[in-house]
């Protein structure tokens, strides 16, 4: 929604979601796992690539209890080169009238994470996971998309990096991926969550314990989205609706892919899918972290 004017100077923000508990990682804080020869963490590479692509600011979403560690490991260093702000995601940061159900431990999901940025992010943005590496081209494509003019005031105008399936697969077992369905203009129709994707003995890509195969060049979503501040405003209304239905759940999450898919189905958003040749790297599990070194 809104009108972007050609030629106006536009600043852009990188939002990094780093508040997840990371229960599958097994040791330490996975977002701060050292990856490079000089003890770089995966965010170092993402922030460098984002700056090279033209992003001006970094907003890092974390838990309050790991603030000092984040600043020691990366924040105090990168603030010399980019504007950096921290936003805290808390399980009890809820709208008036709602409370945390007894026994719930995990945050409310990526939708709530981005919503936490409402008072901080006032520019076009790209949002990524802290523990994933997306590559240089993905940042460039989405940055250029954000600064292009558009005048559709009836729908949320968004972008998504489309990764080639074969560039996202793990050697450590099967994975779940969001298979993208697009039209002839590369506009997103929907994302189908597909489980159990991996190579069989013949080197073919299969899924969900079937003999059916997937094309290795199929585009998938790796949760790298581009949007504008009005989308964050919408998340506030959507979060109240989500809590009205799921507020007593121990594990229900307010997730960006589901939120955006609902907007697509209601014809309230348009999402441009930009194909990137970059290889995606993640450190969801500790063995995958070691294999990435």
Where are these regions (language model features)?
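N-terminal glycine-rich phosphate-binding loop and ensuing alpha1 helix
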Residues: 7-75, 84, 89, 123
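A short, conserved beta-strand element in the Rossmann-like catalytic core
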Residues: 22, 133-135
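Short phosphate-binding loop-to-helix
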Residues: 78-123
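Short, surface-exposed amphipathic charged segments that create phosphate/polyanion-binding patches used
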Residues: 96-107, 173-178, 287-291
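Short beta-strand-to-loop acidic/aromatic patch adjacent to the donor-nucleotide binding site
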Residues: 123-133
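Conserved core of the sugar-phosphate nucleotidyltransferase
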Residues: 136-225, 229
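Catalytic beta-strand/loop signature of glycosyltransferases that borders the donor
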Residues: 219, 271-278
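A C-terminal functional module that forms or caps the active site or interfaces directly
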Residues: 236-269
């Amino acid at each position: 929604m809104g009108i972007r004017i050609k030629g106006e100077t536009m600043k852009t923000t990188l939002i990094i979601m780093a508040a997840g508990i990371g229960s599958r990682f097994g040791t330490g804080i996975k977002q701060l796992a050292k990856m490079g020869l000089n003890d770089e963490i995966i965010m170092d590479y993402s922030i460098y690539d984002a700056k090279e692509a033209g992003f001006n600011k970094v907003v890092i979403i974390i838990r309050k209890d790991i603030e000092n560690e984040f600043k020691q490991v990366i924040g105090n260093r990168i603030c010399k080169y980019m504007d950096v702000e921290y936003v805290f995601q808390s399980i009890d940061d809820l709208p008036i009238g709602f409370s945390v159900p007894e026994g719930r431990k995990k945050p409310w999901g990526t939708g709530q994470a981005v919503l936490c940025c409402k008072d901080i992010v006032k520019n076009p943005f790209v949002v990524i996971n802290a523990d994933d590496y997306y590559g240089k081209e993905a940042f460039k494509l989405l940055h250029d998309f954000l600064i292009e003019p558009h005048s559709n005031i009836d729908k949320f105008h968004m972008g998504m990096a489309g990764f080639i399936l074969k560039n996202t697969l793990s050697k450590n077992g099967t994975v779940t991926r969001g298979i993208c369905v697009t039209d002839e203009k590369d506009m997103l129709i929907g994302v189908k969550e597909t489980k159990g994707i991996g190579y069989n003995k013949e080197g073919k890509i299969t899924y969900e314990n079937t003999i059916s195969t997937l094309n290795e060049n199929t585009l998938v979503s790796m949760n790298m989205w581009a949007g504008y501040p009005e989308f964050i405003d919408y998340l506030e209304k959507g979060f109240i609706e989500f809590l009205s239905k799921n507020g007593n759940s121990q594990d229900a999450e307010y997730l960006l892919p589901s939120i955006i898919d609902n907007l697509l189905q209601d014809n309230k958003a348009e999402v441009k899918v930009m194909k990137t040749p970059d290889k995606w790297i993640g450190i969801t599990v500790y063995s995958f972290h070691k294999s990435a070194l």
